[in-house]
């Protein structure tokens, strides 16, 4: 869980901004969205394999 403590004389807006940044970096919201619906293991594997293929194609394009 993202834990943000207020610093000296820090406004609520800046603390909220730090909290939102930390939540984004930790991937908490994307994880929660992913877990809202059940995904069958074969579907999960397909999605991950497709992502790996996309990354490999992108790396190959960048290398040339």
UniProtKB/Swiss-Prot annotation:
Protein name: Small ribosomal subunit protein bS21
Region of interest called Disordered, as start-end residue ranges on this chain: 26-64
Family listed: Belongs to the bacterial ribosomal protein bS21 family.
InterPro entries the record matches: Ribosomal_bS21 (IPR001911), Ribosomal_bS21_sf (IPR038380)
Transcription regulation recorded as keyword: no
MF terms (GO), sorted A to Z: structural constituent of ribosome
GO biological process, one term: translation
Keywords: Ribonucleoprotein, Ribosomal protein
Compositional bias of kind Basic residues: 43-64
Keyword Nucleotide-binding: no
Any one Gene Ontology cellular component term annotated for this protein: ribosome
